[in-house]
Each structure stands twice: as C-alpha cells, then as structure tokens.
Amino acid sequence: MARIAGVNIPTAKRVPIALTYITGIGNTSAKAICEAVGIDATRRVNELSDAEILAIREHIDANYSVEGDLRREVQMNIKRLMDLGCYRGLRHRRNLPVRGQRTHTNARTRKGPAKAIAGKKK
C-alpha cells in the first residue's frame, strides 16, 4: 500500500479514485493532481513507481491542506466564530443548525435525540 499524507491509499484502484481517500482531496482535486504530476488517470496505484508516488506526495504537500491540518483549520474557524459571538458562532455554541434551516420540527441530527416532556400525550 502506498502511503500519502499519512493515509494508506488502496493499491488496486485507479489513481484519482485512490487519492480521494485522503481527507481534503475530492474528485476534481485528484484529477488535477494527476494532470499536474503527469500521471495518466487510468493507471492503478500498484502500477506507479516510487518516484511517481513521491511526486504526488510532494505536490499534495506543497499545494493542498489535507488530513489533520485541514481538520485543525476548520476547528479553528469554528472556534473563531464562537469567540466573535456572531450569529453563526452562537448557533455552533448551542448545537443548532448554522445555515438557516428550520428548527421547529426536524433538525434532530444537530439537536440530538428528542427530550421527553411529561404530560405531552393527550
């Protein structure tokens, strides 16, 4: 298995598909990486030489924020919003939907399981 950005990518899959196993790299980015490094998108990971894997690794390190760094960056952005006390930060702090969804009904994923209220059944 090839190891790129701390992730073991599957060897039997095509290179662009295998690169999407890295957090922060989607389909478009994976195809752009293959094009930039000069690797055919139809090749499989087990067909790559060590030099090609090294080229992919260096390109990702130089141009993309991936895995732990990306997660840390997202968490810092959320923390910044919460510290500012803006509306989005308050919604994060209260574990409510941030992007304007309704909360009268639904939003159970964000709010958690429904809390039982005594005397509700009538």
UniProtKB/Swiss-Prot annotation:
It holds the Pfam family Ribosomal_S13. SUPFAM superfamilies: S13-like H2TH domain (SSF46946). Gene3D superfamilies: 1.10.8.50, 30s ribosomal protein s13, domain 2. GO terms for molecular function: rRNA binding; structural constituent of ribosome; tRNA binding. InterPro entries: Rbsml_uS13_C, Ribosomal_uS13, Ribosomal_uS13-like_H2TH, Ribosomal_uS13_bac-type, Ribosomal_uS13_CS. Residues 98-122 are annotated as: Disordered. The keyword RNA-binding applies. Part of the 30S ribosomal subunit. Forms a loose heterodimer with protein S19. Forms two bridges to the 50S subunit in the 70S ribosome. Located at the top of the head of the 30S subunit, it contacts several helices of the 16S rRNA. In the 70S ribosome it contacts the 23S rRNA (bridge B1a) and protein L5 of the 50S subunit (bridge B1b), connecting the 2 subunits; these bridges are implicated in subunit movement. Contacts the tRNAs in the A and P-sites. Belongs to the universal ribosomal protein uS13 family. This is Small ribosomal subunit protein uS13. It comes from Ruegeria pomeroyi (strain ATCC 700808 / DSM 15171 / DSS-3).
